[in-house]
Amino acid sequence: MNILENINTEKRNPRSLNLDSMSIAEAVSLMIDEEYGVIEALKEQHRNITEVILATSYSLRNGGRIIYIGAGTSGRLGILDAVECPPTFSVDYNTIVGLIAGGEKAFIQAQEGAEDDANFGKEDLQSINLTAKDIVIGIAASGRTPYVIGALEYANSIGATTVAISCTKQAKISKYAKYSIEAVPGPEVLTGSTRLKAGTTQKLILNMISTLSMVSVGKVYQNLMVDVKPTNQKLIERSKNIVCEATGVDYTTAEKFYLKANKSVKVAIVMILNNCDYEKALAILKNNNNFIKS
């Protein structure tokens, strides 16, 4: 039995049948054109993506975590999204977690066979002490990865919310999740190479999940990352510029309040907008559930 026969990500793309004989310029044009399928796939899944983000936001507001879990490219994309959240939003590294079949070493070197054992998915979730407050997002372009299915089964068994993200219709993993996103960008230019359009599609979905979930818990004011962690010179300068943009003050004033606020962009903004001291700004934020109210 051919288990991959009817999976969208394994089909041949008729537009790239002659990829090996195309000029580089022709192949570049083809690959650019093929990316339009990604946006159409996302538009088609608008409602499902929205439902997932409402669920992740609910989990975060109630003390839960977002857990991405996948194998290969899908697992790496989850890790990429997760590790960017602490510096961008000043959340704990355990707030959004990325897990990959084969462990951390699989991020830079493929661990053959790791994705084929459903029990590994369960064990990886147990290792981070998964709770019913958490939301587990299983990612698999093919929609059938045993590692992901095992993780979703375990998450369901303890009452955690579950999500399946795939790039094929009627994906097997969707049957194991409360919410599912089946975004199908079409066959790859290089047959079966899901690091291409499927990977791009998944990355854009994860971008939306993490960014808009953070918006929902007060990590953004207007469109500014007011909880940015100033860990290098670029981010220190960005922090001061954010204070300028949010309040309309000049750079010198922004820098003064930034330092008075112990280098917290959010607190500096509240101090300026409310003409108050540091302690009062903290109290205002606490009263507003850490949202800036202008």
Curated annotation (Swiss-Prot):
SUPFAM superfamilies: SIS domain (SSF53697)
Domain SIS: 56-219
Record GO terms (molecular function): carbohydrate derivative binding; carbon-oxygen lyase activity; ether hydrolase activity
Reactions listed under catalytic activity: N-acetyl-D-muramate 6-phosphate + H2O = N-acetyl-D-glucosamine 6-phosphate + (R)-lactate
GO biological process: 1,6-anhydro-N-acetyl-beta-muramic acid catabolic process; amino sugar catabolic process; N-acetylmuramic acid catabolic process; peptidoglycan turnover
EC assignment: 4.2.1.126
Matches recorded under InterPro entries: Etherase_MurQ, Glucokinase_regulatory_CS, MURQ/GCKR, SIS_dom, SIS_dom_sf
Entry keywords, A to Z: Carbohydrate metabolism, Lyase
Metabolic or biological pathway: Amino-sugar metabolism; 1,6-anhydro-N-acetylmuramate degradation; Amino-sugar metabolism; N-acetylmuramate degradation; Cell wall biogenesis; peptidoglycan recycling
Name of a matching Pfam family: GKRP_SIS_N
EC class of the enzyme, as a word: lyase
Active-site positions on this chain: E84 (proton donor), E115
Entry annotated with the keyword Lyase: yes
ATP-binding recorded as keyword: no
Family classification: Belongs to the GCKR-like family. MurNAc-6-P etherase subfamily.
Assembly with partners or alone: Homodimer.
Additional record remark: A lyase-type mechanism (elimination/hydration) is suggested for the cleavage of the lactyl ether bond of MurNAc 6-phosphate, with the formation of an alpha,beta-unsaturated aldehyde intermediate with (E)-stereochemistry, followed by the syn addition of water to give product.
Annotated function: Specifically catalyzes the cleavage of the D-lactyl ether substituent of MurNAc 6-phosphate, producing GlcNAc 6-phosphate and D-lactate. Together with AnmK, is also required for the utilization of anhydro-N-acetylmuramic acid (anhMurNAc) either imported from the medium or derived from its own cell wall murein, and thus plays a role in cell wall recycling.
PANTHER family attached to this UniProt entry: GLUCOKINASE REGULATORY PROTEIN
Name this protein carries in UniProt: N-acetylmuramic acid 6-phosphate etherase
Lineage: Bacteria, Pseudomonadati, Pseudomonadota, Gammaproteobacteria, Thiotrichales
